[in-house]
Amino acid sequence: MVASAPASAGTKGVIRQVIGPVLDVEFPAGKLPKIYNALRVEAKNTSGQDVALTAEVQQLLGDHRVRAVAMSGTDGLVRGMEAVDTGAPISVPVGEATLGRIFNVLGEPVDEQGPVKTKTTAPIHREAPKLTELETKPKVFETGIKVIDLLAPYRQGGKVGLFGGAGVGKTVLIQELINNIAKEHGGVSVFGGVGERTREGNDLYEEFKESGVINADDLSKSKVALCYGQMNEPPGARMRVGLSALTMAEHFRDVNKQDVLLFVDNIFRFVQAGSEVSALLGRMPSAVGYQPTLGTDVGTLQERVASTVEGSITSIQAVYVPADDLTDPAPATTFAHLDATTVLNRALASKGIYPAVDPLDSSSTMLQPAVVGDEHYRTARAVQSTLQRYKELQDIIAILGLDELSEDDRQTVDRARKVEKFLSQPFFVAEIFTGMPGKYVKLDETIAGFNQILAGELDDLPEQAFYLVGSIEEVKAKAQKMAAESK
């Protein structure tokens, strides 16, 4: 961490070279800024227009020069312009005042809602928590979403990869998780939009307002802070906006002592931005053109996402897989840090099973008897083996029909279909679209429900009674209602 009144603060340097987003700046002897210090350039360009940008020092070159990466466009910069050392890293606003607001990488509000009502800021660079500060005992983070809690449970203070194409329900799942942590855990969320489409960022903001996650009338009642560095922005912004969002989350954990959800969409773009500036910084490219510091860059970000004795940051990261190649260095490096994967499946979404989480592809390191207990583990494995058997039988059913199956296989198919339907669930944030009240299902209710289905206790209930409900009691009530209506 940089001292509060560094000797280099206010030192003026001169821009000597501009190559795309990278600047070389010369400072007086003995007054070089430190690595990660922010430099501020405020001047007029050749057309007489104001130029204002912030750059972050990345390298000390010798000959009193430093090399810095700009956080915004370098159009209009010319050699000879003045750059001032701020004496500290980029700092962003933190605390309750950030909720319901949208920020850029520098912590400046970009939502036209006026200035942020806080003087509390924090630098975006800091050390990961020490081992002695960490909560090392694995603890399941209950989401209230049946398919996740049963088959791929999240670890409190862990990291989850969210895989899924366009239109399969990533955003709705993210919104529901934000809603549930606010209601059930009294926690807040931070959303880091890293290198994704501007339209998606705007759509997400509007959907948050519609679903009540952001309260437009009283921002203090909002449950999420947003930090965007979009696809059209320079690589410097995309490379650092994840750290800006993480810094906001760390304040809620360490100072407010809350459980925080940190969403990063998309973690691949963070790596991509690093590779864009790597060559300009004079580093030799590594495998597939990525930066040689790939492992360090990802590790520095991921190790700060942790559960401490004060509170936890549970991170859910959308992971783009280039050309569906899981061996690509970017996703491969990310996978090493993940505790769980939630895979969204288009085939399930097309069947109307929401959330469209694939029960066979999703996985978690938490799903072991020593952590979740024997009953949970046995139930989860029984659900997966039933669904796997159903998947194997689908080709036979498609060709020969159900009647050609053995009695045991027919029973397996019947129960698997009920299990598949029961894995669906109405969401609070989708109430305005579905007209159905959302459901938060406790883990013990989830386990009890699936046990009853697999034990054959509900074989006489119609399949449709299991669709889009919460607990197993609602299934029974729905079945009774359906029976009464059919008379």
Curated annotation (Swiss-Prot):
Transmembrane segments: none annotated. Keywords: ATP synthesis, ATP-binding, CF(1), Hydrogen ion transport, Ion transport, Membrane, Nucleotide-binding, Thylakoid, Translocase, Transport. Its EC number is 7.1.2.2. It is a peripheral membrane protein. It comes from the Bacteria. It catalyses: ATP + H2O + 4 H(+)(in) = ADP + phosphate + 5 H(+)(out). Pfam families: ATP-synt_ab (PF00006), ATP-synt_ab_N (PF02874), ATP-synt_VA_C (PF22919). The keyword Translocase applies. GO terms for cellular component: plasma membrane-derived thylakoid membrane; proton-transporting ATP synthase complex. InterPro entries: AAA+_ATPase, ATP-synt_VA_C, ATP_synth_F1_bsu, ATPase_a/bsu_AS, ATPase_alpha/beta_chains, ATPase_F1/V1/A1_a/bsu_N, ATPase_F1/V1/A1_a/bsu_N_sf, ATPase_F1/V1/A1_a/bsu_nucl-bd. Gene3D superfamilies: 2.40.10.170, Bovine Mitochondrial F1-atpase, Atp Synthase Beta Chain, Chain D, domain 3, P-loop containing nucleotide triphosphate hydrolases. Coiled coil: none annotated. GO terms for molecular function: ATP binding; ATP hydrolysis activity; proton-transporting ATP synthase activity, rotational mechanism. ATP binds at G164, G165, A166, G167, V168, G169, K170, T171. It is an enzyme of class 7 (translocase). It is found in: Cellular thylakoid membrane. Signal peptide: none annotated. PROSITE patterns: ATPASE_ALPHA_BETA. F-type ATPases have 2 components, CF(1) - the catalytic core - and CF(0) - the membrane proton channel. CF(1) has five subunits: alpha(3), beta(3), gamma(1), delta(1), epsilon(1). CF(0) has four main subunits: a(1), b(1), b'(1) and c(9-12). Produces ATP from ADP in the presence of a proton gradient across the membrane. The catalytic sites are hosted primarily by the beta subunits. Belongs to the ATPase alpha/beta chains family. This is ATP synthase subunit beta. It comes from Synechococcus sp. (strain CC9902). The gene is atpD.
